[in-house]
């Protein structure tokens, strides 16, 4: 059966129902175009719903000059925040070589500038989104703290803070004692913190649900449990063959399927080299939990209050396309958090989760045009929620013929270090 999604003249077909695809659909509808979202699901494995729940403008890219000296440690130590278990994989080897090329001071500086500009666009739009969606979006502009226990962690945090100031983001520094005065949950071993004033926290699943609801209210269409198996271009536009046997068609198409974009990108004339980076979270019921979202500097763990529960999230595990929960990684996650929050030892575990983040070797997302009438938006790594509104703006501006900013050109398909 063929469904003519282009029956509405300016309707756009969006492959991918994570936060990036949803925000593109929302932006299209707000600017007078139509949108049909094809969402493969299921919800419970989506990194858009299981991430740390923090909007972190100016967050650094994964490749940095600090990574290469730790490379062997990352491969051999299962407790490393970025763990790369050795396995025979030519795509992984190529990715690692390209990743190593990205771990230079010059590329890090350029990436920080680009991610900072993109996240600034997003942050401004989150304020408007919070007003539009109301309490259902759970967007709380309460700031996010960066907390450390070691002198090395402090130096690392202060270097990133310098970058944030250059990019125009505000911060507030606290001693460990000041932090504990504000929030007694933190350990006596904590030496200090920086509060990122532009940070926000949220329940990412609730945000996705609120945006989905708004898409429907604006006249958009959302197909759930609808996996796209192939894409082709015909004389009348783009056609997506789905697992249900239906063919969805439209004059324009956006591929925003996260790590699953790899297999479809060639159909729109784009090559994207990504690796699935598995992340984990635990949901806890913890007495006297911290009240502000935080990133724990040394173990690279995110802590986010979500209603009566606390989300503990983190780790990057390059172990291929699978959703196997690795107990050792969960233990590492909780041990890292417990060093900062002693009360976690008596917390009740309510849920555990893992999902696959789409990570490029460059550390930058891929945002731009494919073959005529097609666009791609993927590779956001851990920053899908943070960068989604800005990504949607770049895609829709380009679709409507508005000039792209010079700094965003490095995000186009085919960019290399």
Please report, for each region that a protein language model flagged, where it lies by residue.
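A conserved short coil-to-beta-strand element within the FAD-binding core of flavoproteins
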Residues: 174-182, 200, 224-238
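N-terminal Rossmann-like FAD-binding beta1-loop-alpha1 element of flavoenzymes
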Residues: 10-37
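Active-site substrate-recognition segment that forms the wall
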Residues: 40, 51-55, 59, 63-102, ...
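Rossmann-like flavin
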Residues: 94-213
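C-terminal catalytic lobe of FAD-dependent flavoproteins
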Residues: 298, 341-417
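Glycine-rich FAD pyrophosphate-binding loop
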Residues: 30-50
